[in-house]
Amino acid sequence: MTIVTNLSFPRIGARRELKRALESHWRGETDATQLQHTARELRARHWQLQRDTGVDLPPSNDFSLYDHVLDTAFLFDAIPQRYRALADADPLAGYFAMARGRQADGIDLHALEMTKWFDTNYHYLVPELHRDQHFALRGNKPIAEFEEALALGITTRPVLLGPVSFLLLSKTVDGSNRLDLLERLLPVYTQLLRQLQASGAEWVQIDEPTLVLDLDAQTQQAFRKAYAALNQGPRPKLLLTSYFGPLGDNLELALQLPADGLHIDLVRGTEQLDAVLNTLPAGRVLSAGLVNGRNIWRTALDNALTLARYAQGRIGKDHVWLAPSCSLLHVPVDLEQEKNLDADVRNWLAFAKQKLSELRVLADALDNKPEAETALTQTRQALEARRQSPKVHRPEVAQRLAALTPDTTQRNTAYPQRSQAQQQTLNLPAYPTTTIGSFPQTLEVREARAQFKSGKLSESDYETFLKAETERCIRTQEEIGLDVLVHGEFERNDMVEYFGEQLDGFIFTKLGWVQSYGSRCVKPPIIYGDVVRPAPMTVTWSAYAQSLTDKPMKGMLTGPVTMLQWSFVRDDQERAQTCRQIALALRDEVQDLEKAGIKVIQIDEPAIREGLPLRRGEWADYLNWAVESFRIASSNVRDTTQIHTHMCYSEFNDIIEAVAALDADVISIETSRSRMELLDAFVKFRYPNAIGPGVYDIHSPRVPQEEEMVLLLKKARAVLPPEQLWVNPDCGLKTRGWKETRAALQTMVHAAQRLRAE
């Protein structure tokens, strides 16, 4: 019999039950007992769903109240000193303080740093370690959840983040080498594995996703040392698990490690199958990741079946398990909830539950069960319908793409000439001031949008409300003395969804939520077909806003790469091609904004860096088409029209050439928290265009002092010519309150005025 297994199931619940339970607890409305009750209910439901769907060996310890990397740090007592007293007195409060920070009862703790989980849209909390770090088992979460499932009659495979990946995903606060801590960490892992075996666990899944990265010799040696140590003494069987790409030059290393099974991603790394089968040690299980755990399209089951049959033919049926390519954390729970989705598009999709069903079909087909043929036929029909659908393929888009030339991506003249033309048109002072785009979305704004969407507020009344909010925002900016204004974006819910709702080729689910971090869930758009802009998207609001003021008004757009990165993207063509389609739609919007009298247009690209492939050797190709897409969107304007972009990264050194190649007239970046250190990359590179280094952190309600901003600007002025500098906050102001926004912007304008006066 062919075994079906799973690496991890979404935690949040089909209707975001975990989100609601967490936020209720954080508001003090429910206690820890009630929160844990909801967590147990979700785990039980998810284990049962997996068994009912045909999963032979579901995972346990894949559930988390916030983040699995934080769980690992907490489990091994890697708790920074500032949280220690709270964690000892109240473990759950300490855990959430590490995740979210805490300001209560005289305690003021900031949270751990958060960053992207590899190249996904999930965020993990970065453990803080130090040279003298001590590790010890704290609690028994993996064992407790294994036994919890066992009490329900379900045998699971506990999931652990592996020791080397745990250290590589952490940071040291004292500059010491993370891998030097491996020797102290390994005895704790060994102890945990021994306890899991004593509890009855036959298999443990040990995730080492860093095996798909570029690894130096020291890191490769750390893997050998770690797994030699874990192989000493009693332990369950280990399934060494890689995902998010092929093992590549780490394949030999992975096969040298003493594990009993190996999971490989055959969606992103189909080409590695032969190499794995040629060198897999005899008797070792191969877990074949055949179903895409990161996207929402039905699997081409015939193709997957061919790979699975080939693998079974090479190493035997008993040694090939079927699995998703990676955790199902990255997809929504259940397509069956989407009752109102376009029927054709719905038939092309598979969410977490459906992906497990696909694996069961594959297993049944491999076991020659006749019922599999019906499902295989349905899949073939769905895939063929998608291939032939006029909803997917628009001839006019193909024609536009074919007509692209190098000139399509070029401005009329170089930046020095353009900047002179723009200054003559805009007549801006030195150190011009602006904001990044959004202004506070108050409770009134959110309630009005909700009432409009539910039909309780008419379109005309909603428009009247939005116009009033927009005018109030503009008058406030004029009173503060900002030089280039924005309209506030009160009509927008989300910087991708707002545009996606107005573009053909995008579709939105009602309950297609995935976890971004903690209780924050996002509902990514689905790009199912060729992207076309049927009508202008932002021109009406930008033109209205410009009519209210004599100062320049920025048109605000989300860039093509960001729209791509934050969506579920069609898998029937290259991502680069889809990105160019979005860029062409934005190109039309940019042209219409210019025709409507908008002289400054900002195209935000916060996601260019996070789209970088995991292997550095693949960066150049990605950056080439990412830059090309931005330039397709932004290059069809007169010299007098000023193109801005905004980026919020913690590192620019390794992509600075690509950032310069965008050829935006002005780039605003997030620099206040690094005290302008991020500017070093621009200085070393001699970045030629204008830069707006953020002078205050919008993620905090704190209003900085004028002197702080002046010092930051002087620091910037010391390394960049004054004529290159703009003055702006770090990011958009959507999540802030009006009181602190007004005060902070007023202070920012005063700081700019002081520098002008010098």
Swiss-Prot record:
Gene3D superfamilies listed in its UniProt record: 3.20.20.210
Keywords for this protein: Amino-acid biosynthesis, Metal-binding, Methionine biosynthesis, Methyltransferase, Repeat, Transferase, Zinc
Entry's cofactor comment: Binds 1 zinc ion per subunit.
Coiled-coil residues: none
Entries under InterPro entries matching the protein: Cbl-indep_Met_Synth_N (IPR013215), Cobalamin-indep_Met_synthase (IPR006276), Met_Synth_C/arc (IPR002629), UROD/MetE-like_sf (IPR038071)
Entry annotated with the keyword Nucleotidyltransferase: no
SUPFAM superfamilies: UROD/MetE-like
Known pathway: Amino-acid biosynthesis; L-methionine biosynthesis via de novo pathway; L-methionine from L-homocysteine (MetE route): step 1/1
Residues annotated to bind Zn(2+): 646, 648, 670, 731
Residues that hold 5-methyltetrahydropteroyltri-L-glutamate according to the record: 16-19, 116, 520-521, 566, 610
Catalytic activity: 5-methyltetrahydropteroyltri-L-glutamate + L-homocysteine = tetrahydropteroyltri-L-glutamate + L-methionine
Binding site for L-methionine: 436-438, 489, 604
Gene Ontology biological process terms from the UniProt entry: methionine biosynthetic process; methylation
Organism superkingdom: Bacteria
Record flagged with keyword Plastid: no
Residues forming the catalytic site: 699 (proton donor)
Annotated EC: 2.1.1.14
NCBIfam families, sorted: met_syn_B12ind, PRK05222.1
Protein name from the UniProt record: 5-methyltetrahydropteroyltriglutamate--homocysteine methyltransferase
